[in-house]
Amino acid sequence: MKKSNPLFDELIVIDDPTPRPGPLNMAIDEVLLSRARSAILRFYRWNEPAISFGYFVTFAEASIAAGDRAMVRRWTGGGIVPHGADLTYSIMIGSNSDTFSLPSKSIYENVHRALCSALMATNGDGPLLAVAALYERRNEADSAVIDRRYNDCFASPVHADVMVNGRKIAGAAQRKTRCGLLHQGSIQRGNLSEEFRRIFSQLLANQFITSAIDLDILSTAEELGDTKYAADAWLHRR
């Protein structure tokens, strides 16, 4: 797979096989970010149908969209994202990585450009994904199909989201802190192959190594998930 100017020199890739509850998934991302020395890509799964909603979305708005699904507030921004039939991933970029100095929008676009190329290379959904492209917003009124009810992330494409036949299939949200940048993304295609994950990783970095979540990180994340992400104070903070 040909690649030009990948975002990272080296990337640690974690394909987490265990479906986990939303609060634990969010906590694992935060703990990995706090310990990232370079860049980490994590693919993960959910143990039940759920929605995640951005830091600035109100609980009242998110609960309307959730229905009877589980809910978790993200540390990142963005809108409301359905989980369970998607492939969810996160990228943690440590502050000592050269990539951390890039503008957040540039990181967003480059991640999605690699994702788009990986989708087209593996073509997991047949001819549909062969026409995947990045969204380019020319002005606020150029798309009449945008539906902003309930802050629905996938009804509201922003620049560099991944589109197929006019519909958004991949988006992400970010948070940048002194210790690094967290990029949390969702691809609304749950049947993507291991080959897709491999090619996506290859396109992001000059080299990547596979790893797993160690017990110390998992233990710390379990405590953080219980005390922060599963707590009413966090869920109802807005």
Where are these regions (language model features)?
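Active-site loop/lid in soluble adenylation, ligation, and acyl-transfer enzymes
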Residues: 2-66, 70-74, 80, 90, ...
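Short glycine/proline-enriched loop/turn "hinge" motifs that connect secondary-structure elements
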Residues: 3, 79-85, 148, 174-179
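Short terminal or interdomain "cap/linker" segment that borders an active site or interface and mediates
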Residues: 15-18, 151-179, 184
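Short connector loops at helix/strand junctions that flank enzyme active sites
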Residues: 48, 66, 82-86, 157, ...
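Helix-start/capping segments and mature chain N-termini
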Residues: 69, 95-113, 162, 172, ...
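Residues forming anionic-ligand binding surfaces in small-molecule and nucleic-acid pockets
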Residues: 79, 83-98
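Long, positively charged amphipathic alpha-helical accessory segments at protein N-termini or as interdomain linkers
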Residues: 112-147, 152, 174-238
